[in-house]
Amino acid sequence: MARYEDLPYRTCVGMMLLNAEGLVFIGRRSGGIEHVDDSHVWQMPQGGVDPGEDTWAAAKRELYEETSVQSVEKLGEISDWLIYDIPRTVAGRAWKGRYRGQRQKWYAVRFTGLDSEIDVTTPGGGHKAEFISWRWEPMQNLPNLIVPFKRPVYERVVKEFSALGFPEPKASVGHR
């Protein structure tokens, strides 16, 4: 087995899904080796980029595979790749011991559909559910809900997208 320091990072994408009120979708993870702390089981959709796949296409695919959501409009992206290491104690078991962490490209999108479109228990494309429940959460709360080793990434995502976490402006009604 390769030394931890020699393992590569898995190339992934993350998606911040904002509703019209400026709240962010978070899903409650169904568990997994990399979740070392049961009190921090909430996260935004994220997943791997397939070989040759564009990161924006991967982000839309992952969002659909984890939430069934397709009704979105792109608001922004973080130009940098954000990186985190998984704890050494689980590195040999997570992702079959092939990676030391993830390098992620993050996107923000506005959800333009109805909440009834969201289905985490039988997500799109027949994929295995990664979440057991979901909710809308204020953006500033996100770093405290994620496992500690991902917290710096979430802090950066919140900082970069903080201006997007406001409600959509309502159309004004003209005066007669």
UniProtKB/Swiss-Prot annotation:
<dbReference type="GO" id="GO:0034432">
    <property type="term" value="F:bis(5'-adenosyl)-pentaphosphatase activity"/>
</dbReference>
<dbReference type="GO" id="GO:0019693">
    <property type="term" value="P:ribose phosphate metabolic process"/>
</dbReference>
<feature type="domain" description="Nudix hydrolase">
    <location>
        <begin position="8"/>
        <end position="159"/>
    </location>
</feature>
<feature type="short sequence motif" description="Nudix box">
    <location>
        <begin position="47"/>
        <end position="68"/>
    </location>
</feature>
<dbReference type="InterPro" id="IPR015797">
    <property type="entry name" value="NUDIX_hydrolase-like_dom_sf"/>
</dbReference>
<dbReference type="InterPro" id="IPR000086">
    <property type="entry name" value="NUDIX_hydrolase_dom"/>
</dbReference>
<comment type="similarity">
    <text>Belongs to the Nudix hydrolase family. RppH subfamily.</text>
</comment>
<protein>
    <recommendedName>
        <fullName>RNA pyrophosphohydrolase</fullName>
        <ecNumber>3.6.1.-</ecNumber>
    </recommendedName>
</protein>
<dbReference type="GO" id="GO:0006753">
    <property type="term" value="P:nucleoside phosphate metabolic process"/>
</dbReference>
<dbReference type="GO" id="GO:0008893">
    <property type="term" value="F:guanosine-3',5'-bis(diphosphate) 3'-diphosphatase activity"/>
</dbReference>
<comment type="function">
    <text>Accelerates the degradation of transcripts by removing pyrophosphate from the 5'-end of triphosphorylated RNA, leading to a more labile monophosphorylated state that can stimulate subsequent ribonuclease cleavage.</text>
</comment>
<dbReference type="Pfam" id="PF00293">
    <property type="entry name" value="NUDIX"/>
</dbReference>
<keyword id="KW-0378">Hydrolase</keyword>
<dbReference type="InterPro" id="IPR022927">
    <property type="entry name" value="RppH"/>
</dbReference>
